[in-house]
Amino acid sequence: MENNKCGTMRGESVYLAYPFILGSVIFVEFFIFGLVYLTFGLGLKTIIITSGVILICLLPISIILIRLFIKSIAGKNKGKLIKKYTKLKILNKKYKILKVLLFIVGINFYLFGNLVSLNINPYTKFVLYSISAFFIIISIVVGDVIVEFYENGVFINPLGFYKWGEVGKEDLNDRLILKIDKLVIECKR
């Protein structure tokens, strides 16, 4: 059986950009169109179709903005790329529990919106559904990271940039177990 290599990095900072920006885009969109629905009395079908079209347009824009944001927080001389891991898994139990709890919260908001839909106005229903989408999206993307080893440090997208620690460049094999602050990440290629 292959022994996993283990290394420790000195973390500088942790960022969770993707979940909150993407979730916020969806939340704001439904919030605005909920107001439009109440103000101008547009049909629910029109609002849903228009929201979907605008969401499709907003996602690429938000991804571009996220990329720029990530570059700004990691705006350092990273040096040459040594190795990139794309199949990663955060082994901390609290992240697994967090994913499940966030998903349950999102489903609860969705079910609550369905159960009380006859007794509430459409605006409130939109708010409940947007909150549901926000939590479900966060539950899906929490722990979804990419690790890139550069000459001058390690960039964990979207968590941030870290300096080299005890892990050596010769240890960058498949199934590397990387410890950064309190995070434990299994790296696979």
Swiss-Prot record:
It is found in: Cell membrane. Its main location: membrane. The keyword Transmembrane helix applies. The keyword Transmembrane helix applies. The chain crosses the membrane at residues 20-40, 46-66, 100-120, 126-146. It comes from the Archaea. Signal peptide: none annotated. It is a multi-pass membrane protein. GO terms for cellular component: plasma membrane. Keywords: Cell membrane, Membrane, Transmembrane, Transmembrane helix. To M.jannaschii MJ0795.1 and MJ1249.1. This is Uncharacterized protein MJ0785.1. It comes from Methanocaldococcus jannaschii (strain ATCC 43067 / DSM 2661 / JAL-1 / JCM 10045 / NBRC 100440) (Methanococcus jannaschii). The lineage of its organism: Archaea, Methanobacteriati, Methanobacteriota, Methanomada group, Methanococci.
